[in-house]
A protein has these predicted regions:
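N-terminal cationic-hydrophobic initiation segments that often serve targeting/anchoring roles
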Residues: 4-7, 39, 69-70, 143
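Glycine/small-residue-rich interface belts in oligomeric ring/scaffold proteins
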Residues: 22-46, 52-61
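Active-site cores that bind ATP or allylic diphosphates and position pyrophosphate for catalysis
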Residues: 49-185
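N-terminal catalytic cores of NTP/NDP-binding nucleotidyl/phosphoryl-transfer enzymes
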Residues: 1-34
């Protein structure tokens, strides 16, 4: 609905993971059902992101997605974001592509920090939600390949990645936790 407000007459393409998602986990919904859902919600074309990209980090997922959209000569990319602050995310994306940032990131990784924590520390403890991190990776990918794709972000109003239920919506992590708990019984 938000995308329709921004681009009512454009073709909407969704690049989605297939049967395997980040961390190589099987998707809770098979790719055909996900496609049906996307089409029923106003998407015009669904493209499966190859598992090589979809089963890896946000950085690799974003690179694969942006490369696909760029090859299709898409004009825009729209993504969800907790902060909904595109200017801030663009600034961070630019900083994160510098040699100084890379050195700082490597130092924190060498100290044993997880990638998200090391990334945050390298940015002077800038706190980013999981959707902001993916948004940042889309922006980095656009910059890296020098794409003309224009980015837009939409505020994530519902739950965050690790949140429990809120207003009848649950995060992906919470849904996986419920399913795992059910399987243990």
């Amino acid at each position: 609905q938000e995308i329709d407000k921004l681009f009512e007459d454009n073709i909407k393409i969704a690049v989605m993971s297939g049967d395997y998602v980040q961390r190589g986990e099987p998707s809770l919904i098979n790719k055909f059902e996900k496609t049906k859902i996307a089409l029923s919600q106003g998407i015009d074309i669904v493209i499966e992101l190859p598992a090589f990209y979809s089963a890896q980090s946000a950085e690799i997922f974003a690179k694969g997605s942006v490369n696909l959209l760029n090859k299709l000569s898409c004009s825009y990319i729209v993504f969800g974001s907790e902060s909904n602050d595109l200017d801030k995310l663009k600034r961070i994306a630019t900083i994160s592509l510098t040699k100084e940032f890379e050195l700082s990131l490597r130092e924190f990784l060498a100290e044993g920090f997880s990638y998200p924590t090391a990334f945050s520390k390298a940015l002077f403890d800038e706190k980013l939600g999981s959707n902001d991190i993916l948004a940042l990776e889309y922006l980095r990918a656009i910059n890296t390949i020098n794409s003309k794709i224009e980015a837009y972000c939409i505020k994530r109003e519902k739950t965050g990645y690790y949140d429990d239920e809120k207003d009848n919506f649950s995060s992906a992590t919470y849904i996986r936790k419920i399913l795992l708990d059910c399987n243990k019984k």
